[in-house]
Amino acid sequence: MIRYDLSTALSFLEAHDLEAVRPRAEAAHRMLLERTGPGHEMLGWRDLLLQPDDALLEDIDTTAAEIREQADVFLCLGIGGSYLGARAVIEALAPQFRSPVEAETERPRLPEVLFAGHHLSGRYLKELLAYLEGRSVYVNVISKSGTTLETMLAFRVLRPWLEARFPDAARRIIVTTDPARGRLHDMAETFGYRRYAIPPGVGGRFSVLTPVGLLPIAVAGIDIRSLFYGAVEMCERLRETADNPALDYAALRYLFHERGYAIELLAVFEPRLSGIGAWWQQLFGESEGKAGKGLYPDAIQYSTDLHSLGQYVQEGRRHLIETFLMVEREPEPLTIPDTGDDLDGLAYLAGRTVQEVNRKAYEGARKAHADGGVPVSTVWLERLAPGSLGACLYFFMHAVAISGYLLGVNPFDQPGVEAYKREMYRLLGKS
């Protein structure tokens, strides 16, 4: 389901470089599998794939079916890994434009999945409340600790709003949190909210295949079993060191990091994959960016950003590498019409497909950027479907673990994010 092409990037290295670093990469890979590396207690994201819980998947599907039946809007409150994974999968696989209402019910075929609690904009919350007025709303509050300021502040605003409008407000609130402790856990106990547990040993940025991501994804009408088992299949494939694309990706990134490269661009040519880019950005930024190490991850969308950042990528400082995330098989090609004239200068494209033009844009950018001194490689998804996307998610999670171990850091903690919180809470007068 995943293919990794690093042939062009290898031309920027000596012939023996990749093989020379491979023993270290394989050792990092064994640390992950044998649970001997730093942060090994946070490998719950692998454990849940090694022992799939089909009963949990069925329960999530049942809850999602109720929400799809009852809700106009499903509102997810979360920040970072508590929303980026779900948003990425939904943007990649759900319809991009709202379906027409059903004639008999005048209700959308699927509830609208919205996100809040991922920033501190009061204006956004006010406009959100106005938008929700008169709509049937369910809320999913996602926070392992129950102390995440952005998320819990949004819930503090929304809870009385829900209680004032829905007699069954407690049933409409679903929390995803620690199974045994924390403020959100205790609130669920007090008010009788339904709960889903974030499994032990799963950090936020690795939680997309837990109820954190699976419930919103299921509400959006996406097949979570195919998504989950696509990841299971990739997890099994990546157990071996031979023909291991995640190991190759981590090793290549490490080689360029050690040669002074500072930035990795993840470039997509399919707008639906932009959310995967945002999820990838957090995954690699929080996992690697410590002890003065790590490539700065930046996700961009082509061909749009070729008209803004393309100049820098082509001729700016030579301190970046570029990874393309592409889809091999595109469904339902759109043919460019023959309009009978050439007033727009595009008659040479008549009869070809928009997808073909997009592919040539990728091929052109790949060659031009490589010729301009940027090491480029490509991660290929087989198709834009739940199984392939699940494989993609696991591929990047596995790769970042190896990459962190290669750098000599714990890829599963994020001590630096506490610094701004301490200053913010001090300024707010929190005791």
Annotate the PLM regions:
Residues 62, 122-130, 250-254, 326, ...:
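Short, charged beta->alpha transition segments
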Residues 82-85, 122-124, 147-150, 181-185, ...:
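Flexible loop/turn segments at secondary-structure boundaries
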